[in-house]
């Protein structure tokens, strides 16, 4: 990509990892040169240059604390606008036996890993390997052989912000994660959100679950625990990204998946719609109308289905007609057929529910 100047750029954003690297660089530069920088130019692991503003910087003896405000560009998320504080302490006597002269630790508001299967060791702060590498790469240009630094990353209110993310489900407790492979948040790509979903699969496999339950979101999670007696780490929330998450599941060797969730989302899979966001495609009424027509040729019923406002309305129509189970069993079967033809090698089953968690239809490959 070359160079991005985030003093001017409003489309792209920068990751929490890039914030940490920029803050660490500015703090160390201040310690060594007694000069406050309003911005720094760092490089990511692809050797792109990122110019990132520094919000504030202070010095206390051999320690400097830099604050960088997270900017998400056009992909506004829960972390946009939060402060990340990076405290750097310089030691002129490097007697460390560690291979690196940069020690990176987590402070308040950075989560701690409590479940296996993630990129970071149990009990360690949730600072992913790529951000660590980016911090080290940029600081080494300022360090001599006999110098070492401790970099402490903190996020004020990080514990509260993290409650609105997937971190608690992933077993990352007490704060957010420091993430990012390139340091760049690309607009409207959903890349960062997709990447935050994928570790659920790693956690499930690390806990030796053979059958994973893929759900669209909270409704599916809640009722899978009740109806299927599923455990938290067995349930994988995919949001709208079925294509992405099923590709990840196949890459990671998952062999058995139960698709479970509300009819409004799951029905779309029967139509071959694997990004279920409404802006991509809908066709719920059309799909249900087609499968109802296999059971009844009552034109009035079919017209009502096409004109319905919600999937729940269609459920009521089919219930009154006495064909609810037959229609949704057929839809469930088609979901399994669609998924099996695209992701061969995985045994699929499907259960469709309503908002109350009542089963509407199911199909099991056996």
UniProtKB/Swiss-Prot annotation:
> Can you supply a Gene Ontology BP term from the record?
methylation
The biological pathway it contributes to is:
Cofactor biosynthesis; adenosylcobalamin biosynthesis; cob(II)yrinate a,c-diamide from sirohydrochlorin (anaerobic route): step 6/10
- Please name the GO terms that the record assigns under molecular function: cobalt-precorrin-5B C1-methyltransferase activity
> Which Pfam families does the annotation name?
CbiD
Per the UniProt record, which EC number(s) apply here?
2.1.1.195
Catalytic reaction(s) noted: Co-precorrin-5B + S-adenosyl-L-methionine = Co-precorrin-6A + S-adenosyl-L-homocysteine
Q: Does the keyword Heme apply?
A: no
Q: What keywords sit in the KW lines? A: Cobalamin biosynthesis, Methyltransferase, S-adenosyl-L-methionine, Transferase
Query: Family per UniProt?
Result: Belongs to the CbiD family.
Q: Which PANTHER family match?
A: COBALT-PRECORRIN-5B C(1)-METHYLTRANSFERASE
According to UniProt, the name of this protein is Cobalt-precorrin-5B C(1)-methyltransferase
Organism from which the protein derives: Methanococcus maripaludis (strain C7 / ATCC BAA-1331)
The gene for this chain is cbiD
């Amino acid at each position: 990509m070359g160079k991005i100047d985030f003093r001017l750029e409003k489309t792209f954003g920068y990751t929490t990892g890039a914030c940490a690297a920029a803050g660490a660089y500015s703090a160390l530069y201040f310690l060594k040169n007694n000069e406050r920088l309003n911005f720094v130019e760092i490089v990511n692991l692809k050797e792109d240059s990122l110019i990132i503003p520094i919000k504030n910087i202070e010095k206390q003896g051999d320690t400097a604390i830099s604050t960088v405000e997270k900017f998400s560009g056009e992909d506004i998320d829960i972390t946009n606008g939060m402060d990340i504080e990076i405290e750097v302490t310089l030691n002129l006597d490097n007697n460390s036996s560690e291979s690196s002269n940069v020690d990176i630790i987590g402070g308040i508001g950075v989560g701690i890993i409590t479940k296996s299967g993630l990129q970071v060791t149990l009990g360690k702060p949730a600072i992913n390997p790529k951000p660590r590498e980016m911090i080290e790469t940029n600081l080494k240009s300022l360090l001599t052989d006999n110098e070492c630094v401790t970099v402490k990353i903190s996020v004020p209110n990080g514990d509260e912000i993290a409650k609105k993310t997937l971190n608690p489900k992933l077993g990352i407790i007490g704060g957010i994660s420091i993430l990012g492979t390139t340091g760049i948040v690309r607009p409207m790509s959903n890349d960062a959100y997709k990447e935050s979903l994928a570790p659920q699969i790693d956690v499930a496999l690390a806990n030796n679950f053979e059958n994973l339950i893929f759900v669209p979101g909270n409704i599916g999670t809640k009722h899978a625990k009740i109806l299927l007696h599923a455990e938290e780490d067995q349930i994988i929330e995919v949001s709208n990204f079925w294509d992405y998450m099923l590709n990840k599941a196949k890459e990671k060797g998952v062999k058995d998946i139960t698709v479970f969730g509300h009819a409004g989302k799951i029905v779309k899979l029967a139509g071959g719609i694997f990004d279920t966001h409404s802006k991509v495609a809908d066709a719920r009424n059309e799909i249900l109308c087609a499968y109802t027509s296999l059971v009844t040729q009552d034109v009035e019923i079919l017209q009502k289905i096409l004109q319905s406002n919600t999937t729940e309305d269609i459920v009521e129509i089919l219930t009154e007609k006495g064909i609810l189970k037959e229609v949704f069993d057929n839809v469930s079967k088609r979901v399994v057929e669609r998924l099996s033809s695209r992701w061969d090698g995985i045994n699929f089953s499907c259960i469709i529910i309503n908002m109350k968690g009542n089963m509407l239809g199911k199909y099991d490959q056996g």
